[in-house]
Curated annotation (Swiss-Prot):
It comes from Mesorhizobium japonicum (strain LMG 29417 / CECT 9101 / MAFF 303099). Gene3D superfamilies: 3.40.140.20, Methylglyoxal synthase-like domain. The IMP cyclohydrolase activity resides in the N-terminal region. GO terms for cellular component: cytosol. One of its GO terms (biological process) is 'de novo' IMP biosynthetic process. Pathway: Purine metabolism; IMP biosynthesis via de novo pathway; 5-formamido-1-(5-phospho-D-ribosyl)imidazole-4-carboxamide from 5-amino-1-(5-phospho-D-ribosyl)imidazole-4-carboxamide (10-formyl THF route): step 1/1; Purine metabolism; IMP biosynthesis via de novo pathway; IMP from 5-formamido-1-(5-phospho-D-ribosyl)imidazole-4-carboxamide: step 1/1. The gene is purH. Belongs to the PurH family. The keyword Hydrolase applies. InterPro entries: AICAR_Tfase_dup_dom_sf, Cytidine_deaminase-like, MGS-like_dom, MGS-like_dom_sf, PurH-like. Its EC number is 2.1.2.3, 3.5.4.10. Pfam families: AICARFT_IMPCHas, MGS. This is Bifunctional purine biosynthesis protein PurH.
Amino acid sequence: MAVAAKNIPAPDLVPVRRALLSVFDKTGLIDFARALAAAGVELVSTGGTAKAIAEAGLAVRDVSELTGFPEIMDGRVKTLHPSVHGALLGVRDDPEHAAAMRKYGIEPIDLLVSNLYPFEEVRRSGADYAAIVENIDIGGPAMIRASAKNHAYVAIVTDPGDYASVLNALEMNIGSLSLDFRKKLAAKAFARTATYDAAISGWFAEALEIEHPTWRAFGGRLTEVMRYGENPHQSAGFYVNGDKRPGVATARQLQGKQLSYNNINDTDAAFELAGEFDPSRSAAVAIIKHANPCGVAEGTSLKSAYAKALACDPVSAFGGIVAVNRTLDAEAAEDIVKTFTEVIIAPDATDEAAAIVAAKKNLRLLVTGGLPDPRSPGTTVKSVAGGLLVQGRDNAVVDDLELKVVTKRAPTPAEMADLKFAFRVAKHVKSNAIVYAKDGATVGIGAGQMSRVDSSRIAARKALDAAEAAGMTEPLTTGSVVASDAFFPFADGLLAAVAAGATAVIQPGGSMNDKDVIAAADEHGIAMVFTGVRHFRH
């Protein structure tokens, strides 16, 4: 049975006469406190916050004056007291509440200013277990939730970014705050404590290796409201969750227009693919369109890798995203800007490269400070009607797999290098995925088809188109290798690769018809390798 409500109407304007300030992040605190004091608001505070306010020459009461109880246990207990929570939770127009406040000498608090111990930052810093636990705030969330619940009478400010709007509202309403304004502050406060608790519960699950906890929460902070989502009739916002994995969420944008929803989605896909390639071994470039690769290549330089990647599908590359695995240099930048590109993302960029990109004022340039580790664990989340699908990140890397040659002919060393390259790329292509590759570059990519053989045929067709556009007399797939993200259920997919001129195949294996597919490969002198790992991507 639910708790019954008394349905006491909330006042519109509530005068702010007393404020309790208890913050860890003291950004803007003194100016805000000074403005409140100038408006005649009595300041009450705790610990380090009270000290900072007093040192600024402002009159402030320590919270212990309200509670009659000192701060104890290394500051763990400061505000967990009826005199504080009664002051925040009391319904002023409820006669019983008002009588209790008078009886116990509880002085009402009209404004709470509170932000929390930096749990998320301490967790990301690699601190030990005890330090992380010590940075779980208890009193702060308790006060925030109390104030937010009682927004009928109390305003709660959790973000220093809101100080100016609070002062403006107080000035506009002659020392009061409106109910609508208090509701908005309360909504933000509950979102903040929910996000905070989500981070804590997520850390515990990770620390205790609980793969699928009974209850799971996901939190994030809004960084921007976008013009629209995937389509103009859809609204969109970008939230970051504090994960420091190098990528679009952690990048610095050096120049260019605001990123769109589709830009962010495609840029994430591009950089995750670039992260598959060790920069100490080779330069690598990935060109992405609609979250699918349209060209990927390795080279001795970013310039050479970009040229090879672009040659795979120059038509689709128009308006695409370019991701690189090394510092963007001037030579590569000069070539990239010749084709209309939406975003370039790189671990870093030289000043010369940045200047070249700056000539294209709308082209976004992002630098991340590093590459995403393809082997690191993580979580992916997809919303479905009424729920969430949660799974571990696909962190299988072909170099770590036990590859099995299943045909009479084994791949040559050059073929094996290309097979591994192609399988890396196939991991990032929407299923059904087929990737043709030669000499460390994709030459044909088939993505997103319901039939694997159709993906194979499309990849071969695109390779033929690219060859014709380049004035070549034979298809790019001649002498190539082919990777499939999942097994060939029948020999037809492999035979399509044979028809395109492929000489070797890499695929997970595991079909009931593996023997037929292997026999077809042997019949045509094709070398085939099984990985034992599938890379479906939807």
